[in-house]
Amino acid sequence: MSLVDRAGVGAAAWVVTSAVFSVPLVAWGLWRPSVALPVLLVAVAVAVRVARSVPCVAGPRWAAISLVLVAVAGGVWAGATHAEHIVLRRDAGTYALSAQHLATAHRLGVDVDVPALGGAAALATAGVTVASPGFYARGSGARTRVVPQFLPATPVLLSLGWWADGWTGLLLAPAVGLALALLAFGALARRLVGPAWAVAATAALALTQPVLHAGRATYSEPFALLVGCAAASVLVAATSRSLEDRALRRLGLLAGLLAGGVALVRIDALRESALLLPVVALLAARRSPTARPLLAGLGLATVYAFATALLVSRPYLGAVAGSLLPLAAAVVVLAGGSAVALRVRRWPRALVVRLPLVLAVATLLGFAVLASRPLWLVVRQSAADPGARVVAGLQLAQGLAVDGGRTYDEETVGWTAWWVGVPALLLALAAAVLLAHRLGVALRDGAALPAWLAPAIVGVASTALTLYRPGITPDHPWADRRLVPVVLPTVLLLAAAAVRHLTARAATAPSPHSAPDGTAEPHRVARVRSRTPVGGVVAGVVGLGLLAGPAAAATWPVAGQRTERGEVAAVDQACAALRPGDTAVLVDDRAANEWPQVLRGVCGVPSVVVRSRAGTPGTAAVRTVVAGVRAAGRRPVLVSAGSAAALEQLGASARQVVDLRTTEDQRLLTRRPGGSASLDVDLWLGPVSSGPS
């Protein structure tokens, strides 16, 4: 079925094309249906043309239909249990609010009505800001504005859901992305492990809680998974030896554009772009027609993605510079090393002869080092980092030794094993070691490069780097989404390859009546044939259990969990309690962290934060802002999300307008999550009739 092999690639091409076209529209404030929809239709035409150029994989019809059903079921499951994370606490809230603002204001940047906030003098007061988590303040004085944290591709895609059906459409968009991502992963798996085992691998991926969690809330991971898997699938096709050179060049260019285009969704995808450079070098060394187009597409898309980040997300780049600088260094080192390798005509014979063993042992040792780190290493960051205070609070609440500087990076192999199981992890390791050895043999003997070259090198290396340094607050299940774009797909593909190999061996195992070389004696052929299918079936059932069983068991406790239910209604209540001419002055820490963009972007009420000191609202700063708001002819409304006391201390009469009891995901540091935690969402308003005391 061509649909299975081409739908994911077409969807990924549409995502990347739409993201490319949207950047100037978003920057110029033109992202509105009347302009965007024609552009998106052009992107559809491009995607259809691109998808038709991708060769299909032969296979039984039942396998293709099963794969589609698995992908649809995964998307429906995520959609039926979707979160309503709007009141901002984590990245999902940032994406949701950015997308809502983009859909309604037609640009990512948030304009700030400086006079309505008390004027430039009030904003210059110590402790007064328009910034909040996920939204940076840019400029000063009358030119102050707010910039969302992340790259524009995900908000652009989510904004389409808003245009379709408001909050419901926006919150369901990631589930649609997840279904397409599973289809793209399945298409990649069909090329690597065959149509039948592709169904098992895709089902296992859909069952893992981190993947389900990413599809339930407004995260970028489903779209990154979609484009990344499609890029890998096209690249496998581009290294096929059954196509003519012109087709291989076309597929190589497409693979490069898609691979580089992932960085339009997630900036850390620059890591995978860098890791493709050695692949390009190997292809070039074998004079593959794919090499140059692949490099051209990769370079073009990566440069465009980085330029986009500089244009619309510059503050975010500064915030993650500690992660980006090593990536930039890796690009330079890998590019330089690849160029040097291409110029070396003769490698030392001792190295060439032992290359298969060297690569296999290096793979095994790399895993051993990563997996053993909890025995001999505790990874820490600066205790002054804002994340360290969060970790310290979680440690205290969970009865752990308080050490806020811990990142728990050394535990990442364990995180992965939580969701796929130790057997699948060991199967993946065995497959990775075997593939490393086979690659060494191909390089040593000058044989043709295998089609799995690029996914194996990039997938294994990126998995190792992600596990080495995940770069995320280590509470679960939130931190586990770092495993979604590359780690879990790579592990499950390798495990599926190992199971397929073992199943094939079981199905063709020599009987007691085989000849010494393992072939069946002629007069025993019928008897051998009657036995071998049983071994294959048993091995297949066991393999399927090893792939999907642990994932299903780990996810089962949270399979039907819906978090943040009621937040859409809570936001509506907050907006209804405010009126035209109001200016929201947020005076406690929780209000300052969770509500500024909700009130500013969703309710349309100018909002300013007055940071408290030691838990006490800054009275002098509040007085300055209130006076400036009044001078502008507006009504200042003090806002608290922690308690009414913060408003009463300032002389305002507090009225609770939001009183929601809901749930959120657990925030565990050392255990696999298996449930939800209670969450209170409150909001008090205090209109100021006279100056605060």
Regions found by a protein language model. Give the residues of each.
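Hydrophobic/aromatic-rich transmembrane helices and adjacent perimembrane loops
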Residues: Y95-A96, A214, E221, W415-A430, ...
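Interfacial juxtamembrane loops and adjacent helix segments
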Residues: Q100-T154, L158-W162, D409-E410
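Short acidic/glycine- and proline-prone juxtamembrane loop motifs at membrane-interface regions
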Residues: P210-F223, D268
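Transmembrane alpha-helical segments
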Residues: V70-A78, A269, T308, Y468-R469, ...
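Transmembrane-helix signature of polytopic, membrane-embedded enzymes
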Residues: F185-L207, L226, E244-G252, I457-V460, ...
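Transmembrane-helix motifs of polytopic, lipid-linked glycan transferases
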Residues: A45-S53, G169-L192, A230
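Membrane-interface alpha helices of multi-pass inner-membrane proteins
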Residues: V26, L188, A201-A203, R250-I267, ...
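Membrane-embedded, hydrophobic transmembrane alpha-helices
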Residues: M1-A63, L248, R286-V433, H437, ...
